[in-house]
Amino acid sequence: MKDLGGLMKQAQAMQQKLADAQARLAETTVDGTSGGGMVTVTLMGNGELVRVLMDESLVQPGEGEVIADLIIAAHADAKKKLDAKQAQMMQDAAGPMAGLMGGLPGMKF
């Protein structure tokens, strides 16, 4: 039974680490770029788009479709980076128990 108590303590500690990691992630921002840096978007840790920066040379008549495509590409770049950062933070928080958590609902590793 000692082992069970130790396992429960480990699980509670990991749960706290995961909650802390999720809180840090909520405050995290990532940038995604496209068009060789002509468009940059910033996402919060929850995926919310909070900023779009564009090179002024893009703001010309007839460039609307190009701008839209570049924004979408920059968003996809930022989302990919955010997903990688989320996975790494959760992996780090779970520590040696990460392998056990992969099969649990709601746990992304």
Swiss-Prot record:
One of its GO terms (molecular function) is DNA binding. Keywords: Cytoplasm, DNA-binding. It is found in: Cytoplasm, Nucleoid. Signal peptide: none annotated. GO terms for cellular component: bacterial nucleoid; cytosol. InterPro entries: YbaB-like_sf, YbaB/EbfC. Binds to DNA and alters its conformation. May be involved in regulation of gene expression, nucleoid organization and DNA protection. Belongs to the YbaB/EbfC family. Homodimer. This is Nucleoid-associated protein CCNA_00269. The lineage of its organism: Bacteria, Pseudomonadati, Pseudomonadota, Alphaproteobacteria, Caulobacterales.
